[in-house]
Every structure is written in structure tokens, then in C-alpha cells.
Amino acid sequence: MKKERTESLVAQALKNIGNDRYMLDNLVFVRVKQLNAGAKTLVNMDPKRHKLVDIAIREIAEGKIDIDRIDERN
């Protein structure tokens, strides 16, 4: 069940950034660095209970993070 949900989140995240897997990898990497440095999550997920990668993917899938917004935060 969780695998299906993760796959659908990744599919939605890819759709939100134009189906570019390399861009998704880069966005997730940068966002995980930000979260690790103390940035607040933009979704209702506790970083102590969830993997930062999962949080970053959900943020992208929900449209809260994209290439323009990630550049502003760096």
C-alpha cells in the first residue's frame, strides 16, 4: 500500500515539473539539504517521523516547491 502511494506521489511530482526526472532529483536534493539545515516543512509531516526525501517529494507533488521557488530559498 505504501509503495503505491509513494509511486503516485512521484508521478504527480514528475508531472508538476514537466516529467523531467533529472530536475526532480535535483529539486529533491536541494530541498532535503534545506530541510536538514532547519527549513520548515511546507506540508503537514513531522521531519522526526518521516524521511526528508518523502517530505520533499510530497512538497513537490502538492505544488508547494518548484524550480522557481527552490531558487528563491537558496
From Swiss-Prot:
GO terms for biological process: DNA-templated transcription. Transmembrane segments: none annotated. InterPro entries: DNA-dir_RNA_pol_omega, Pol_omega/Rpo6/RPB6, RPB6/omega-like_sf. It comes from the Bacteria. It is an enzyme of class 2 (transferase). One of its GO terms (molecular function) is DNA binding. SUPFAM superfamilies: RPB6/omega subunit-like. One of its GO terms (cellular component) is DNA-directed RNA polymerase complex. Pfam families: RNA_pol_Rpb6 (PF01192). It catalyses: RNA(n) + a ribonucleoside 5'-triphosphate = RNA(n+1) + diphosphate. Keywords: DNA-directed RNA polymerase, Nucleotidyltransferase, Transcription, Transferase. Gene3D superfamilies: 3.90.940.10. Its EC number is 2.7.7.6. Belongs to the RNA polymerase subunit omega family. Promotes RNA polymerase assembly. Latches the N- and C-terminal regions of the beta' subunit thereby facilitating its interaction with the beta and alpha subunits. The RNAP catalytic core consists of 2 alpha, 1 beta, 1 beta' and 1 omega subunit. When a sigma factor is associated with the core the holoenzyme is formed, which can initiate transcription. This is DNA-directed RNA polymerase subunit omega. It comes from Helicobacter pylori (strain Shi470).
